[in-house]
Amino acid sequence: MSWDQVWIDVNVATMDPSISAPYGAITNAAIAVKDGKIAWLGPRSELPAFDVLSIPVYRGKGGWITPGLIDAHTHLVFAGNRANEFELRLKGATYEEIARAGGGIISTVNACREADEAELFDLGRQRLNALAKEGVTTVEIKSGYGLDTETELKILRVARELGQHHHVDVKTTFLGAHAVPPEFKDNSDGYVDLIINKMLPAVIAENLADAVDVFCENIAFNLEQTERVLSAAKAAGLQVKLHAEQLSNMGGSELAARLGAKSVDHIEYLDEAGVKALSESGTCAVLLPGAFYFLRETQKPPIDLLRQYGVPMVLASDFNPGSSPICSTLLMLNMGCTLFRLTPEEALAGLTLNAAKALGIEENVGSLVVGKQADFCLWDIATPAQLAYSYGVNPCKDVVKNGKLVHQ
């Protein structure tokens, strides 16, 4: 057989739902890679003969291989920090109170408007490197800290540039409807007009976004405004997604389902009607335990209902300076289990196969199947559950991206 590399002495958590074993596991396995794709995968005893002198062979020492991790919700391109707000919250101020007083997102907006692309790129690269060291091979990056055309484009350009200069694949999302900027404080409809008539066409003209998102909440945009933005995005051929039901239930999830959104994110206040709508539309539910933890929330997402209706559950870091300044997907695995009571298998699916579904890339990544992209990680663990169980010592030993060993 003519392959580019072979991995042996490994166990593989394929996350392939067609394999009935937990995690889609194949023990005592082997993987062969050719032209950036998985060319062979199965028990080591069934591996076809190959020329060991001409093909690199990597030995996993009994460790576990999983698909490369996918962080499907981040805001990692930003300047400044909001440690002062952290102190205010610890003194009793709420997220909404800080936002209504001009803090929150707006303080980061001011920092991003002042920063140039080089500064934003350097900051973003540091954060992307941190995720990559934990086995992340694909990440979604949102804008939303510009709230004017120039800065929104600047953030998206930086996100695209990060993807061009890093082995991690970057999917970009235009989130101009993240908050109402100060200059439109009493005219949110006017700002929505600006998003639809000027920002979105400019984003499309430079091919800067794969999807469009809206923060649908009382402190941001109402249902009518949300639908206007997402309908315009859909008409332009872009995927749509939604921040919804984080602080209240406004029916955003049902709107997302009706529009065929790829995902609805946060969803702490999601009700059964919303869950049913997501199930019927195939929309993913993105769980963000980092924000739940950092904001000290108490309303948990309806995990049992999501299970009951078979809604794909995604885990993501929501890395951002205000509500989840936590640049770690491995910690999300632990938090997803300890805070939301996911099983370790559900948590890992949330950072692999279901995360790929949320980004619309499940045909290429998210599980280990012959013909899919060779994105995978070797972990020094005895069982896949260990990834969610323990935190603090990074067990990621090797990362293969597009068939190339990028971290060892």
Curated annotation (Swiss-Prot):
N-formimidoyl-L-glutamate binds at Y145, N320, G322. It is an enzyme of class 3 (hydrolase). Its EC number is 3.5.2.7. Binds 1 zinc or iron ion per subunit. It catalyses: 4-imidazolone-5-propanoate + H2O = N-formimidoyl-L-glutamate. Disulfide bonds: none annotated. Pfam families: Amidohydro_1 (PF01979). Zn(2+) binds at H73, H75, H243, D318. Keywords: Cytoplasm, Histidine metabolism, Hydrolase, Iron, Metal-binding, Zinc. GO terms for molecular function: imidazolonepropionase activity; iron ion binding; zinc ion binding. SUPFAM superfamilies: Composite domain of metallo-dependent hydrolases, Metallo-dependent hydrolases. Fe(3+) binds at H73, H75, H243, D318. It is found in: Cytoplasm. Catalyzes the hydrolytic cleavage of the carbon-nitrogen bond in imidazolone-5-propanoate to yield N-formimidoyl-L-glutamate. It is the third step in the universal histidine degradation pathway. This is Imidazolonepropionase. The gene is hutI.
